[in-house]
């Protein structure tokens, strides 16, 4: 969130607002080193909509910069697909994958996600310029 290059939120969470935010999710999972307790990444999973579209879920992922290249993201996304199915969702949809997030886009496509097109200038970067976003989906 602080980098302003991938998440739509602009405000950082403190301990109280963070606890409330994560408690609201259908699933919150972490990639943690069991020996040291160090958290390398996490994801949240929740409904993308309500009612007749409530079978579609959405997720967001974060991987610690120093842990990139260790396949943490792949493990998080794969687990998220399993959790989505286990919670009764039928589709996992990403609403806004930023164009410059090429590592994530390649990972999603390698794991079977389908791009739905492009939304020109759909994401305002921290420095104020706009980048395209790509919605993706995966049938669970």
What are these regions (language model features)?
Residues 7-66, 77-78, 83, 139-140:
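Acetyl-CoA-dependent GNAT
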Residues 61-66, 70, 98-100:
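Active-site acidic-Proline motif in GNAT/NAT acetyltransferases
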Residues 84-97, 106:
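Conserved GNAT acetyl-CoA-binding A-motif
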Residues 5, 37-38, 114, 129:
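Residue-level signal for well-ordered, solvent-exposed loop/turn and beta-edge residues enriched
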Residues 93-97, 109-131:
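Conserved catalytic-core motifs of GNAT/GCN5-like acyltransferases
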Residues 1-7:
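Short amphipathic alpha-helix that is part of the acyltransferase structural core
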Residues 58, 103, 110:
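Amphipathic alpha-helical recognition patches that constitute DNA-binding helices
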